[in-house]
Amino acid sequence: MITFDQLDTELQALENPNTIKIFRNHGCPDSLDLYGLKIGDLKKIIRREKLTKNHELAVKLIESNNSDLIYLGLLAINPNKITTEQIEKWNIAFRETWSQLTFGLASIVSKRDDALLFAKTWIESDYDLTKSMGWQIYSEHINNLPEAETLLQRAKETLQTETNRTRYSMNGFIITCGIYKDDLHEKAMEAAKSVGKVHVNLGNTACKVPDAISYIEKARNRTK
């Protein structure tokens, strides 16, 4: 069974300066080491080494100081084998880093039975990336979310006064309501019109915030 040091050595040998530059431009802080591997390459390693069956190693990867190793661990970890204490520990560790890591953590939490408890707490956080995770989790549970209409109204009323990445995730929540909740489609369109253009600092990149109205319309038209 592969070890932490062996994985670290393998990833370091695959270091990609171009991807490192891209990831730094997307917000990966200098406080984190970075080899610049693409997600597809990380997934190949997970399959080859059967990392999803090595829980202890996945935890060790997540608690390292290398963004690639952390994300590798997040992709490999079993959501139901981690504790709420570990999740909060990782939230604290990642909330001032960058969106790839918090996206990965939110994706894990979304697969748990207690996901909505985290979402409810996290959207009230003082930390932008933590709040963003809360809204991401709500989006991923849209089909089993009794409070969806209340949250949609909150997004409509407060999005433009929210912090940076939280605006991005709230915009995503409006889009999700508009596409996947027939009973909220019209209200989501109204919310998108009321909110208007959403500005998010996405770093030194060409990435753009999706326009909610056109995104919803295109997605709905594809399903007709």
From Swiss-Prot:
It comes from the Bacteria. This is Uncharacterized protein Lmo0209. It comes from Listeria monocytogenes serovar 1/2a (strain ATCC BAA-679 / EGD-e). SUPFAM superfamilies: ARM repeat.
